[in-house]
Amino acid sequence: MGAGATGLRGARLSPEERANSSKSRAIDRALSKDHTDDLNRFKILLLGTAESGKSTIFKQMRVLHLDGYAKEDALEYLSIIHSNCMEALTQLVDACTAFGINHDITVQEDVNRFEDFKRKLRDPEGLVIPVVIGRCMDRVWHSPSLQLCYDTRRFRFALLDSAKYFMDNIVRLTEDNYVPSIQDIVHCRISTTGINELAFNYKKMDFKMVDVGGQRSERRKWIHCFDNVDMILFIVSMSDYDQLDPEDNKYNRMKQSYEIFKTIVHSDLFRHASIVLFLNKYDVFVEKLKTSPLRRSFKNYEGDNSEESAREFIKKLFRRCITDRHKFFVFETTATDTGNIDLVFGSAVAHIVNENLRSAGLHE
């Protein structure tokens, strides 16, 4: 009995001890919660050169993981979409002239009407294409001369990636009371300037995605986003393999992307970050290979001109930069395809979570 009483007395805690124990448990819970929050909070830095499709990925995250675009938000893209339509048709008409492709009389009249509308534009920033000009643009687009130029020479001159999408839909896009759809917004091209952030929840995890401009003048801003990055999402345009940098036409655009990627992954700032590479515009890459062999731009490429061989060469090119293969993941993407981006982003997150658990000894 005495021994039992002693045991009981030894198990009792004074009020101070009970208070300290309660406080200790509260601290443990708080630390555990902070640790859990840290595991569940991902900062993604979205990087890539101009026109890689980086901002399209950013828009897709809003579509997939937030509420998309309300009517008033969508209407802010109307002038941008109409500007893209004007740019696309201008590029095609100019290419016809450059390649000596002549229009028949009625098409030339529509081309003249289109050019006259451009000359009279007073406010390009607030551009709205009238219905009658939209119909005119549609006739020019469907003319034999424009179709010949597009079908046989579209990879031989600068052309907006979404030119076909916008031209195929020009009548709808210029109707009265037109409100841009999600796909219209996803396809539109606008240069990113400054730093844009998007916070969203996915698979019970909180994400913050940071998008900065890809133009050379914007890259100096990247350093301001480098704190506490969990994942670098680097976007490379696969279709750039035979393109020169418009800001400095001495440099191949894909080789330039490679050099920037190498600098990023070798930086001490990102030694703990996972690296995800999106090889974007894969659909355009496959089409281009039919008329522009990879070996023409990469002299050290010894494979054939098949999609599989060319793709693996480019993958290996970027993979050579990586020292920790466990933290590197690569996917082929088409940024304008919402389903594709949903699938590959989900796969990337799953790989990273599993790797983090493995590194922590919590997963085989």
Swiss-Prot record:
GO CC aspect terms: axon; cytoplasm; heterotrimeric G-protein complex; neuronal cell body
Q: Which UniProt keywords apply?
A: GTP-binding, Lipoprotein, Magnesium, Metal-binding, Myristate, Nucleotide-binding, Transducer
How this chain assembles, per its entry, is: G proteins are composed of 3 units; alpha, beta and gamma. The alpha chain contains the guanine nucleotide binding site.
Report if keyword Nucleotide-binding is assigned.
Answer: yes
Per the record, which residues fall in region G4 motif? 276-283
Q: Which GO terms describe its molecular function?
A: G protein-coupled receptor binding; G-protein beta/gamma-subunit complex binding; GTP binding; GTPase activity; metal ion binding
At the top level of its lineage, which domain of life is listed?
A: Eukaryota
- Please give the function described in this protein's UniProt entry: Guanine nucleotide-binding proteins (G proteins) are involved as modulators or transducers in various transmembrane signaling systems.
Q: Where is this region: G5 motif?
A: 333-338
Domain G-alpha intervals: 40-363
Q: Biological process (GO) annotations? A: adenylate cyclase-modulating G protein-coupled receptor signaling pathway
> What PANTHER family does the record tag this protein with?
GTP-BINDING PROTEIN ALPHA SUBUNIT, GUANINE NUCLEOTIDE-BINDING PROTEIN ALPHA-6 SUBUNIT
Query: Which sites carry lipid of kind N-myristoyl glycine?
Result: G2
**Positions of the region G2 motif?**
184-192
Quote the InterPro entries the UniProt record gives: Gprotein_alpha_su (IPR001019), GproteinA_insert (IPR011025), P-loop_NTPase (IPR027417)
Family the UniProt entry places it in: Belongs to the G-alpha family.
Annotated stretches, region: Disordered = 1-29
The UniProt record gives the binding positions of Mg(2+) as S55, T192
Which segments carry the region annotation G3 motif? 207-216
- Give me the ranges of the annotated region G1 motif: 43-56
What Gene3D superfamilies would the database entry show?
GI Alpha 1, domain 2-like (1.10.400.10), P-loop containing nucleotide triphosphate hydrolases (3.40.50.300)
The keyword Transcription is assigned to this record: no
Give the protein name, as stated in the record.
Guanine nucleotide-binding protein alpha-6 subunit
- Could you tell me which species this protein originates from? Caenorhabditis elegans
Stretches of Basic and acidic residues bias are at 14-29
Which residues are listed for GTP binding in this entry?
Answer: 48-55, 186-192, 211-215, 280-283, 335
